Amino acid sequence: GAPAAYPIYPSAPPAQQWVQTGPPLASWGDRVLATLIDMLYQLPAIVLYMVGIFVAVINAPTTSTRGVVVNRGNPGLMWLGLALLAIGMLGMMAIGLYNVLALQGKTGQTWGKKRVGIKVIHQETGVILSVGQTFLRQLCHYLDSAVYIGYLWPLWDPMRQTFADKLMKTVVIKIK
């Protein structure tokens, strides 16, 4: 006789959709504006970092292709430049970590998000992420930064989520 037919299984239920019961989702423009505001808070450290690079490079010794020293540079100023670079980098890291982990990890908002009136919440529970979850979400942003497609994702995504939002199951909502 003929082999038995494969059993028929019911189809999978449709993917859970965001039910708009609370505040609207934040626009991509609001998210970009919040990021730019956050960067303004880091501007002094960024300037220090850039000045440090410039001073270090301009005052570094240079050699010819044969290894002959062409310009001895100014070691004192070169080290000053490297110190400024390091201080600027540490400043950017400290400001960024405080803004994202201490503020957003406790309130769902960075300085920029607060100014724009948006907040990060868990997509399913509606609660603010923990500091650890906020750290993981930020790490996902860094992993995606090589191609930046995740940052553009909200432009066509119905949930307006970035790559990191998708992985962490978060949404950014408008609160004012």
What is the role of each PLM region?
Residues 1-146, 162, 166-169, 173-176:
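Short, small/hydrophobic-residue-rich motifs at membrane-helix boundaries and re-entrant hairpins
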Residues 147-158:
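Glycine-rich flap/beta-hairpin and adjacent strands of clan AA aspartyl proteases
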